[in-house]
A protein has these predicted regions:
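Bacterial N-terminal signal peptides
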Residues: 3-14
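Alpha/propeptide regions of enzymes that mature by internal proteolysis
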Residues: 18-392
Length: 392
């Protein structure tokens, strides 16, 4: 059992938090391919739960806290007890996802996937181990060990990232609060201070229902989006970034120093893919790779300064991953993976747009400001390009 903590630093956490009840991309008429699950969220994959802690505070010393933690538990409360098969892929490795050496070697994800800011990876990693020890997961012999998976993106434009405001109790609370059902998006959890294509962004999620080998399966995606420049942004094929040119965070010509052009894509994105389709670790690595195509649809080119790192896991084959001496696992044949690949691309793309739509304007550290994607202007562009689809 996870131990909850009283979070004294969450006094203003509701100011910028977008809730799952607010409009999503489809509500604005953005057309997407594929059939979503009931919630159109990663939690459509049975057993997956998500917990988030959002930290927003204006400190007395003038610094601004705009950060948090997101926890994805593949098997809910049983995630520490029963691993899942998993695989990962770095499209561009200017970032961090701990625990991937053992994930690559073993093919198993043991415990949750945690998302936070770049300079809080260590404290979150340690907190996950501490929670497992506290829950009785440690071997009494003293030889038990854990290599948690913690991934990051940089929120230092809006957040006092060097103030180290994420504490162990925040990671513990994200784990304790994890639940199924709708997932809050936008300025929440690890995505609180993130910026995407120079619009305010954060956490987003989506899902797809597909058939493979005559069976129905679900693929879900959750993103912590913090990548991209405005010029390349495309939504449903519409060159949105070429039209909405105001309030750019990084590439406005007014930001140029000594006549030099402002910087390019220096952000990052973490994509978490979940499925109930029975897949082996090497197949899940193939699935993770397809997340990059969802980014490409959005206009990402995976710039040198961007950490684009993806992880995929399957909740199937629980018995095979339980640690017996000899195990049997089912898996979808390689010739039948295409629908799952396509679903991954579609869900990743929609999750990113959902993150942008849910986010709200935010002012943060040093007065820095990130404007959210303007809904009305997006709808106008969709109609102009014949891509508007009335929500049902």
């Amino acid at each position: 059992m996870f131990v909850g903590f009283l979070l004294m630093t969450l006094a203003a956490s509701s100011i910028f938090a977008a809730t799952a009840a607010e409009p999503r991309a489809r509500d604005l008429g953005v057309p997407f391919e594929g059939s979503p699950g009931t919630l159109n969220a990663i939690t459509d994959v049975a057993g997956v739960s998500v917990g988030q802690v959002t930290l927003v505070e204006d400190l007395a010393d003038g610094n601004k806290v705009r950060t948090g933690v997101t926890a994805i538990l593949p098997r809910g409360r049983g995630s520490f007890d029963t691993p899942v098969f998993g695989g990962w892929f770095a499209l561009n490795g200017n970032g961090e996802m701990t625990g991937t050496a053992w994930l690559e070697e073993s093919g198993q994800l043991e415990g949750p996937v945690m998302l936070t800011n770049t300079h809080s990876v260590g404290v979150v990693r340690d907190a996950v181990i501490a929670e497992r020890v506290r829950a009785g997961g440690a071997d009494a012999s003293g030889y038990w060990w854990s290599l948690p998976v913690v991934a990051e993106t940089w929120d230092g434009h809006l957040n006092d990232i060097n103030g180290f405001h994420v504490k162990p109790e925040h990671a513990a609370q994200a784990l304790s609060d994890a639940k199924d059902g709708p997932v809050a998006e936008g300025n929440v959890g690890g995505g609180t201070g993130m910026v995407c294509h120079e619009f305010k962004c954060g956490i987003g999620t989506a899902s797809r229902r597909v058939a493979a080998e005559g069976q129905g399966y679900t693929v879900g995606a959750l993103v912590q989006a913090n990548y991209g420049v405005r010029d390349t942004l495309r939504i449903a094929g519409v060159p949105v970034g070429q039209h909405l040119r105001e309030d750019r965070v990084y590439t406005d010509l007014a930001l140029a120093v000594a006549g030099e052009q402002p910087g390019g894509d220096t952000g990052s994105i973490i994509v978490v893919i979940a499925t109930d389709a029975p897949l082996l670790p090497h197949q899940l690595k193939r699935l993770a790779k397809r997340a990059g195509m969802g980014l490409a649809r959005m206009g990402s080119y995976a710039g040198n300064g961007s950490g684009d790192i993806f992880i995929a896991f399957s909740t199937a084959n629980a018995a095979a991953a339980a640690g017996a001496a000899v195990n049997q696992a089912q898996f979808v044949g390689n010739d039948h993976l295409d629908t799952l690949f396509e679903a991954t691309v579609q869900a990743t793309e929609e999750a990113i747009v959902n993150a942008m739509v849910a986010a709200r304007d935010m002012r943060g550290e040093d007065g820095h400001y990130a404007k959210a994607l303007p809904h009305a202007e997006l709808v106008k562009l969709l109609k102009r390009y014949g891509r508007y689809e009335r929500s049902r």
